[in-house]
Amino acid sequence: MAAARMLVLLASLCALLLTASAAKWTPAFATFYGGSDASGTMGGACGYGDLYGAGYGTRTAALSTALFNGGASCGACFTIACDTRKTQWCKPGTSITVTATNFCPPNYALSGDAGGWCNPPRRHFDMSQPAWETIAVYRAGIVPVNYRRVPCQRSGGIRFAVNGHSYFELVLVTNVGGSGAVAQMWIKGSGTGWMAMSRNWGANWQSNARLDGQALSFRVQADDGRVVTAADVAPAGWSFGATYTSSAQFY
């Protein structure tokens, strides 16, 4: 009985520690770009292209080197709040959750506190203007913020846009829920076993398997370690340039 109580106590303690970790806020800074309609945020270093079509809309941000992680953070979600203790330009009581869709490159010609906002090791979010104006006043230009990584809430299944050529497949993965960021991918043709893919750039994953004419399945591992499988999501007659929506998702 004592052992059982001890196990319950340990489980409760672990749950409290996990909750505390999930609630941790980290200081950073934020600016904005892309115009009032966010048209200048389309495309970007994650490869999502039309952010409306990809399902991300205007709630997006470009991440500094310290956060972008060479593209491994593409698709991750962050809740950002302006730090009212450090600036008068916040909109008090507000926060917004954004998706990482782009890279904010360093500018080594300027110091980190005078224009080189995204220089390492600074944690910085260059937000879309509509997202920024949810939490801060336009004229401020830059504000101190606090952020935390949060689960991504997505509608529908993970989507796979198959590009490339007959000798390789370049697959753009979008609409990933849960962690949001893809750490590893595998591809399988209807006549093959599972084969590991490699990150080409951003959210684009490459295979040199020559799978023309075979139905395609994908296995996705998020950066929290969870794995889902999208079986036969692209039929045997799939074509380059098409996007295929699966029923698989990190719920």
Swiss-Prot record:
Stretches assigned to coiled coil: none
Claim: Cell wall biogenesis/degradation is one of the keywords in the record: yes
Key words of the record: Cell wall, Cell wall biogenesis/degradation, Disulfide bond, Membrane, Secreted, Signal
InterPro entries given in the database record: Expan_Lol_pI (IPR007118), Expansin (IPR002963), Expansin/allergen_DPBB_dom (IPR007112), Expansin_CBD (IPR007117), Expansin_CBD_sf (IPR036749), RlpA-like_DPBB (IPR009009), RlpA-like_sf (IPR036908)
Signal peptide residues on this chain, from the entry's feature table: 1-22
One Gene Ontology term, aspect cellular component: extracellular region
Gene3D superfamilies, sorted: Expansin, cellulose-binding-like domain, RlpA-like domain
Domain Expansin-like EG45: 43-157
Membrane protein topology class: Peripheral membrane protein
One Pfam family named in its UniProt record: DPBB_1
Record PANTHER family: EXPANSIN-A15
Protein name: Expansin-A8
Organism: Oryza sativa subsp. japonica
